[in-house]
Amino acid sequence: MRDSLLVFCGAGLGGLLRHGLNQVSLRLALFGFPWMTCFINISGSLAMGLLVGYLAGHGDSRFPQSLRLFLATGVLGGYTTFSTFSLENALLIERGAVGLAVLYSLVSVGLGLGGLFLGLTLTRSLS
C-alpha cells in the first residue's frame, strides 16, 4: 500500500510539472508543432536515463526501492510515459534484440495511433 501511495504522489507531481510546462507552451506555439510535448518526451527520457544510469552504478544501498518507485514510476510516469517506452527499447537494444526493439516501436506507435483514431471515430459516430 505504501508503494502505491508513493507512485500516486509522484505521478501527481509529474503531471503537475507537465501541465505547467504545457501552459507555458501555449505562449510559445511555433508553426503548429507540438514543441512542448516533444521537449517533455525528450527530457523525460533523459531523466530516466540519468536515473537508471545512476542506479546501475550505485545499487540498492544508497537508493531504496521506494524512492525508485516515487521517481521513475511516479514522477517520470506522470510527466511522460515516453521515458519508460525509451528505457524499454534501450534495454532491448542493449540485450541485442534490435529487431524486437524496432517491432516494439512500430507496434506501440502504430497501434497507439490506430487506437486513438478508432476512439475518435467511435465517439464521432455516436454524436
UniProtKB/Swiss-Prot annotation:
Keywords: Cell inner membrane, Cell membrane, Ion channel, Ion transport, Membrane, Metal-binding, Sodium, Transmembrane, Transmembrane helix, Transport. It is a multi-pass membrane protein. One of its GO terms (cellular component) is plasma membrane. It comes from the Bacteria. It catalyses: fluoride(in) = fluoride(out). GO terms for molecular function: fluoride channel activity; metal ion binding. Na(+) is not transported, but it plays an essential structural role and its presence is essential for fluoride channel function. Pfam families: CRCB. Na(+) binds at G77, T80. One of its GO terms (biological process) is cellular detoxification of fluoride. The chain crosses the membrane at residues 28-48, 73-93, 98-118. It is found in: Cell inner membrane. Fluoride-specific ion channel. Important for reducing fluoride concentration in the cell, thus reducing its toxicity. Belongs to the fluoride channel Fluc/FEX (TC 1.A.43) family. This is Fluoride-specific ion channel FluC. The gene is fluC.
